[in-house]
């Protein structure tokens, strides 16, 4: 492949302009073209202001800012792009439009030049099918804002030559981005892996387990996400998020793991798109949330009962006993709870009603606790339909005794954190099982592209593959929903006691 020194960006919206910025800063000559005659010139002027701003903030020297600006060229006709070694299209997400553009470019650029699409939702194979030389077409999918989101998906279509992807990976490194390589499949890596977070949170909300503000709070404070799922949906806008959910679900022929929720369709129909419309899951004024519910208040408990622990293993018992000790309580040590005891049950992948049966405890005096949470920041409790208000308040007040937050949920298999994290890890395992990308690229793409605290496979190793397998199996049993069926990748590695990042042995030496 030719050394890439000169590129063109076709389509000068936010994405195209961002790609042009990082390319010019990396020393490449960049041609800008847009079907709207003045748009490319306007993009060049915006980039001049961007470079001046970076210079003013000390992030770019005056000489580098001027050099980057001088590398930008405006093309009035596609024919002016003939000397480019790479053309990146960032035009409207319509298959026919992209196919027509690439057909025209094929007749202009050199035979060895690369044609790349920044599509986020269309098939690279389908785009390339309109070309005489589909082997030189690949995906080069950036994320907004391009200069800050330092990951780019390099997508191999069915006909893409391997050296084309190799060249794009090398270019990504020159641009200061982490290139991740993926097969052409719905959602590629990032939009595919991202289906678990929002859809499972919507399911939890739809089941009445908790309100959206409490679900957001739990996932931020207990699991370490930067934003809760409903905050994120409001930020992105349901006019963007819901069609992506629908698209990937349909492209995978109604695979239950990707199933959207009717609630987002209803909000979309009502025009409640999120921040941009002033109302979504929350209400906004000038982009700022209004009347957002605060944490659940700590009750004044009428009783302070003794505490008996129901745990599946000694590690769980030790974790709970140490927590109670810090709160000034020593748990009962008998095999059965005393007549007045609060039964605190560490449930995994099941609802409290099921845990009560398994531990043979009185449901009226039982409360579940999620040990997958960060217990230093927030404790997540669960009630059964029979838990008395007195025991609910006693458990809440006790576990809030050191100032940590407490969230009380209605009965639900897997609380909130267990369900969401198990689905995220399981979906990443399925991506690995399908051979869409390497385990390293899956983790890097999700960590950098979605901002999760860890890559999903690394996260699964931290949580424990066997524990996650058990959670998913119980969720599937209790709900009967095939969306929770464990990926073979996860099941096999849990059974063998190995890392989720362990690859497959080749069938042929």
Report each predicted region and the residues it spans.
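NAD(P)-dependent Rossmann-like dehydrogenase/reductase catalytic/cofactor-binding core
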Residues: 2, 177-184, 212-509
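Structural motif
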Residues: 10, 18, 33, 68, ...
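Rossmann-fold NAD(P)-binding glycine/threonine-rich loop
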Residues: 100-151, 156-170, 341-392
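Conserved anion/nucleotide-ligand pocket segment
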Residues: 189-192, 201-204
């Amino acid at each position: 492949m030719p050394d890439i020194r000169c590129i063109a960006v076709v389509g000068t919206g936010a994405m195209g302009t961002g790609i042009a910025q990082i390319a010019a800063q990396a020393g490449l000559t960049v041609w800008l073209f847009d079907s709207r005659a003045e748009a490319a010139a306007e993009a060049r002027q915006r980039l001049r202001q961007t470079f001046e701003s970076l210079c003013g903030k000390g992030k770019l020297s005056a000489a580098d800012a001027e050099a980057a600006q001088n590398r930008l060229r405006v093309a009035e006709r596609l024919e002016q792009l003939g000397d480019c070694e790479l053309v990146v299209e960032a035009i409207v997400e319509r298959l026919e439009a992209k196919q027509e553009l690439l057909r025209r470019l094929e007749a202009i650029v050199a035979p060895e030049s690369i044609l790349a699409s920044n599509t986020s939702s269309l098939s690279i194979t389908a785009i390339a099918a309109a070309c005489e030389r589909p082997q030189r077409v690949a995906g080069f999918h950036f994320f907004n804002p391009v200069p800050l989101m330092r990951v780019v998906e390099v997508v191999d279509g069915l006909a893409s030559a391997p050296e084309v992807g190799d060249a794009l990976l090398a270019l990504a490194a020159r641009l200061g981005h982490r290139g991740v390589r993926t097969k052409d499949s719905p959602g590629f890596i990032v939009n595919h892996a991202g289906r678990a977070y929002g859809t499972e949170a919507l399911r939890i909300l739809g089941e009445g387990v908790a309100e959206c503000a409490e679900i957001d709070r739990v996932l931020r404070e207990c699991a370490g996400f930067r934003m809760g799922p409903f905050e994120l949906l409001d930020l992105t806008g349901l006019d963007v998020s819901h069609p992506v959910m629908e698209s990937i679900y349909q492209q995978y022929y109604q695979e239950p793991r990707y199933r959207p929720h009717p609630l987002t369709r209803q909000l979309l129909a009502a025009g409640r798109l999120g921040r941009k419309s002033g109302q979504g899951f929350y209400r906004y004024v000038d982009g700022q949330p209004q009347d957002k519910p605060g944490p659940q208040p700590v009750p004044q408990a009428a009783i302070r009962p003794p505490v008996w622990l129901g745990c599946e293993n000694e590690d769980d018992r030790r974790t709970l006993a140490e927590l109670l000790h810090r709160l000034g309580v020593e748990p009962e040590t008998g095999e059965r709870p005393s007549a007045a005891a609060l039964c605190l049950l560490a449930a995994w992948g099941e609802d409290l009603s099921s845990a009560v049966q398994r531990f043979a405890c009185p449901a009226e005096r039982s409360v579940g606790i999620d040990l997958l949470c960060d217990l230093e920041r927030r404790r997540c409790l669960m009630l059964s339909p029979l838990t008395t208000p007195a025991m609910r308040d006693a458990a809440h007040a006790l576990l809030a005794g050191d100032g940590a937050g407490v969230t009380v949920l209605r009965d639900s298999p897997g609380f909130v954190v267990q369900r969401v994290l198990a689905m995220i890890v399981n979906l990443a395992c399925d991506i690995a099982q399908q051979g869409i990308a390497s385990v390293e690229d899956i983790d890097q793409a999700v960590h950098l592209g979605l901002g999760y605290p860890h890559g999903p496979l690394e996260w699964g190793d931290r949580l424990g593959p066997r524990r996650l397998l058990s959670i998913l199996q119980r969720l599937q049993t209790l709900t009967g929903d095939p969306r929770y069926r464990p990926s073979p990748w996860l099941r096999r590695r849990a059974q063998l006691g190995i890392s989720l990042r362990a690859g497959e042995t080749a069938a042929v030496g």
